[in-house]
Amino acid sequence: MPTPEIIAHRGASGECPENSLAAFARAIDLGADGIELDVHRASDGTLMVHHDPAPQHAPLAALQGVPIHQLSQDALRTFRAFGEPIPTLEDVLTLVSRQLVVYCELKGVGTAAPACALLADRPAHAAVHSFDHRMVAEARRLAPNLPRGVLQSSYPIEPERSLASVDGRDLWQQHEYLDQALVDAVHARSGRVIAWTVNTPSDILRVAALGVDGICTNHVALARTTLGL
């Protein structure tokens, strides 16, 4: 059975503030095969790496709760989460270079085009995915050579159809809704299954036994140790 990729969920978020440069650097140190991150588009078009639509830890009360798309890159760089600034996608790409794969989740409206512009020249070291399958379809049109994936937190009757609809490669499946039939169905169309977010030894062993292609986890060291890597 092939060894699954170990993908650091928002970086090594079990040890460092999520989606921070420190978390991504730590993921490299721990031997992750890839990092997963989230992007939103700032008001000036910059892609900011952050999970929620509106960042917390604002330096000024007037900025608290303001959505990323209403703030400039300069304003967003004044935010701190446990001492860590919000990085741009370019910051992360500069940090990791091509040492591992960058899996970019398209979160906010208008993120597909700028993400594709930054990632299209590194198809072996980057991919995009989203819960909004329309954005994945847009990425297919803009950067057909860039690997694509769809996120699912349910179990459709034909789980592989959403992947086929965007000519995608990776099905990001919430691990609680993952079984052998789903893995086999995706593999039958030459797709890949990435299980998320898998954080306990028993769950890591279970999804690995199903033959998943990637395990997205907050705990890279735990996953590697559990699998004997």
Give the location of each predicted region.
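Phosphate-group recognition and catalysis centered on beta-loop-alpha active-site segments
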Residues: 1-229
